[in-house]
Amino acid sequence: MAAVSLSVSTVKPLGDRVFVKVSESEEKTAGGILLPDTAKEKPQVGEVVQVGPGKRNDDGSRQAPEVGVGDKVLYSKYAGTDIKLSTDEYVLLSEKDILAVVN
């Protein structure tokens, strides 16, 4: 089997899925204490980098996604599939797992 090179531009979400770049988690507490990786909260905010074509309706038409590339979103804590590309972290979510668009 040939190796596949993954990058953000080669990932195309299907259906109502959304590809989100995860925001950096806090490195220190408010008191200045450095946190080890095991103590950091899992981030729930990120920027949409790819969007699928939308959910297919019963009649075969597509329902357009409510979010677009560049939107900053808040999503469910344990939703989606975590993906690491080079040094950046991403999550592939179903649109229903997105709770809000953050301005």
Swiss-Prot record:
InterPro entries linked to this entry: Chaperonin_GroES, Chaperonin_GroES_sf, Chaprnonin_Cpn10_CS, GroES-like_sf
Keywords: Chaperone, Cytoplasm
Main location: cytoplasm
Alphabetical list of SUPFAM superfamilies matching this protein: GroES-like (SSF50129)
One GO MF term attached to the UniProt entry: protein-folding chaperone binding
GO CC, one annotated term: cytoplasm
SMART domains assigned to the protein according to its UniProt record, in alphabetical order: Cpn10
Keyword hit for Cytoplasm: yes
Subcellular location: Cytoplasm
CDD domains per record: cpn10
Pfam families for the chain: Cpn10
Any single biological process term in GO: chaperone cofactor-dependent protein refolding
Role, per record: Together with the chaperonin GroEL, plays an essential role in assisting protein folding. The GroEL-GroES system forms a nano-cage that allows encapsulation of the non-native substrate proteins and provides a physical environment optimized to promote and accelerate protein folding. GroES binds to the apical surface of the GroEL ring, thereby capping the opening of the GroEL channel.
Family note: Belongs to the GroES chaperonin family.
Quaternary structure annotation from Swiss-Prot or TrEMBL: Heptamer of 7 subunits arranged in a ring. Interacts with the chaperonin GroEL.
Name the UniProt record assigns to this protein: Co-chaperonin GroES
Gene that specifies this protein: groES
